[in-house]
A protein has these predicted regions:
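Short beta->alpha linker loops
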Residues: 28, 61, 102-106, 125-126, ...
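Short, acidic loop-to-helix structural element flanking the phosphoryl-transfer center
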Residues: 92-121, 127, 131, 154-155
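Surface-exposed alpha-helical segments enriched in charged/polar residues
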Residues: 38, 109-112, 162, 182
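Conserved SAM-binding loop
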Residues: 22, 119, 173
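Hydrophobic residues in well-ordered beta-strands that form the structural core
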Residues: 24, 121-123, 193
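N-terminal helical cap/lid subdomain that shapes the substrate entry/recognition surface
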Residues: 7-18, 22-105
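Asp-based, Mg2+/Mn2+-dependent phosphohydrolase catalytic module
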Residues: 1-11, 131-208
Length: 208
């Protein structure tokens, strides 16, 4: 992560996605998702489709993705209570696998360098997961607010703009997925892509 914001506008608020920006747990999450879905099908073709849906849905509330998987791939109806139980079960599995979790290189130095700015987290990950990981990392007190899914990122960004009483161009959202970029675009704030596929944001924003 770079140490200097690449914008001429005076930046007053930094908003971060979580996974892929502050931590990197994607390989573990994909592996555990495959194991979870293998309880419902042994068809490798379907498992591959499910994993692809999961990867394409990073940043989208987990419950939404589960419902999509059951409807479009497994062709099964699933009750909300069942979705909630699967989400809880999945969280427990990732917690066990991520006991030695650490922030991405440079992140702590970066927020320390910009400690005078307001800092928030907006993520599609369940709020309970966010709090668990941030407490484990010992970084919750470094942020003015933390908001996890289910949510619509662009609406939450707009809400923070009103709360912090700043202009749209005085806010930067850091993300690693296309839906993060689209949320920033919809909220009319600046965007920086972190650890992202450079082709995903080519010519549209800074990528690190």
């Amino acid at each position: 992560m770079t140490h200097n914001l690449p914008y001429k506008t005076e930046i007053k608020v930094l908003i971060f996605d979580f996974d892929g920006v502050i931590i990197d747990s994607m390989s573990v999450k994909v592996d555990e998702y495959k194991k979870l879905m293998s309880e419902f099908t042994n068809d490798e073709g379907k498992i591959d489709k499910i994993v692809q849906i999961y990867k394409n849905s990073i940043g989208i509330p987990r419950e939404t993705t589960l419902k999509k998987v059951f409807k479009e791939v497994l062709s099964k109806n699933i009750l909300t209570v069942e979705v909630d139980e699967l989400s809880r079960k999945y969280s427990q599995r990732i917690f066990k696998r991520l006991e030695s979790l650490k922030p991405l290189d440079g992140f702590l130095e970066y927020i320390t360098l910009h400690q005078q700015l307001k800092k928030h987290i907006i993520s599609g990950a369940p709020n309970s997961d966010l709090i668990y990981f941030m407490d484990k990392l010992g970084i919750r007190n470094k942020f003015d607010s933390v908001k996890g899914g289910p949510l619509k990122k662009s609406e939450e960004i707009a809400s923070l703009i009103r709360l912090d009483k700043v202009k749209n161009n005085e806010v930067v959202y850091f993300g690693d997925q296309k839906n993060d970029f689209l949320a920033a675009e919809e909220a009319r704030v600046q965007f920086i892509g972190i650890n992202a596929n450079k082709n995903l944001f080519k010519g549209k924003c800074p990528v690190f």
